[in-house]
Amino acid sequence: MKRTLLTLSIMSTFGATTVFAQDATYQGAAVDAEIANTCIVRFKDDVSKFDVEGKARGMVAKANAQAKHVYKNTIKGMAVNMSCDKAKSAFAGNSDVMRFTPDGKVYASPAKAKGKPGGGGNPQTTPWSVTRVGGPVNGNGYTAWVIDTGIDLDHQDLNVDASRGFSAFSSGRNAGMDDGNGHGTHVAGTIGALDNGIDVVGVAAGTTVVPVKVLDARGSGSWSGVLAGVDHVAVNASPGDCANMSLGGGFNQELNDAVESAAQQSGAFFVVAAGNESQHAANVSPASASHNRVFTISATDSNDRFASFSNYGNPPVDYAAPGVGILSLKNGGGTTTMSGTSMASPAACAVIMMRNGNPGTDGKASNDPDGNADSIVHL
């Protein structure tokens, strides 16, 4: 939500988790090098969105480089396949450039507690987390944008609309919008799993979920890719939609600015995970983004206790939601249990969407480490 007088300068990194233990070795040397040799070149705000592509094309042609992504709807600029040192040299004196930001890693943000396999099938289960926030309710006619690892496009318990979707991956095994990890499908299930007698039911059952794939099969991605996903949502979402971001990394001004701009332009609500490092959420992005349509969510357990892993701090945290031992969907059918602010954010996303940005609350998180107990969202 709207937060003022907040200066952020501390840098940190979202660590890999044991839920997706392979995150720690994501990418290997080859992809690490690709990220290290990508620079986000931001143009000045007065550059017209209609001129961005032409300017980017001309710049990379002269530098004998390539633009991996071009941003024209939120921030303006591009991600180019060279280090920022080389980019600064190549584009020295270009009056359209505001600044250069090195690309970096972004992760899905489940907690360090290991996920447990669930059952699934018949009969349908209503997760405790859904009940705790006042669900399920009928979400037919509503839309949630899941900015994540993709969604299982053929899942029988989801209403997926891939026609409006996006993938930051244009080639290789991660191309397309299908979920190669399971994280995005779990998130989508919490928001809107169908009330159809199987698996689980979501908070806003039957909500149309749109995959915006910015994380790969190992639950990892890049700032440049996430920016591209947010840029897509900015011009495709409608007022009252919800965009969920259960991901994060170190503090990144470009992403915060993009999320704030996308929320302002589209009229959608952006709901983001606070993160799982037991630190102040002001240190990480997009949790530290500030806008009256951006909501940062901490996590609680089934006894309304503040989750030991959850980031904290008011601002930027706005509300808490259930995030420990959360049952939801897995790829291919059935269910699985995960923990994290990744699981809290989609529950809040559904509530905020159904309440048009004015969620009710029911109780507060006990043992909040910042001493200012977060209110728990409720329909």
Where do the language-model regions lie?
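Gram-negative bacterial Sec-dependent N-terminal signal peptides
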Residues: 1-22
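N-terminal domain-start motif of subtilase-like serine proteases
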Residues: 22-33, 83-89, 112-146, 151, ...
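Autoinhibitory propeptides
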Residues: 23-36, 44-49, 53-124
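C-terminal subdomain of the subtilisin-like protease fold in secreted/lumenal serine endopeptidases
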Residues: 30, 68-72, 201-204, 211, ...
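Structural recognition of the beta-strand scaffold that forms the well-ordered cores
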Residues: 40-42, 79, 99-101, 143-147, ...
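Glycine-centered tight turns that cap/initiate beta-strands
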Residues: 93-99, 157, 267, 291-296
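Substrate-binding/specificity loop regions of serine endopeptidase catalytic domains
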Residues: 109-114, 200-201, 220-226, 245-318, ...
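Subtilisin-like serine protease catalytic core
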Residues: 134-164, 175-225, 238-241, 289-293, ...
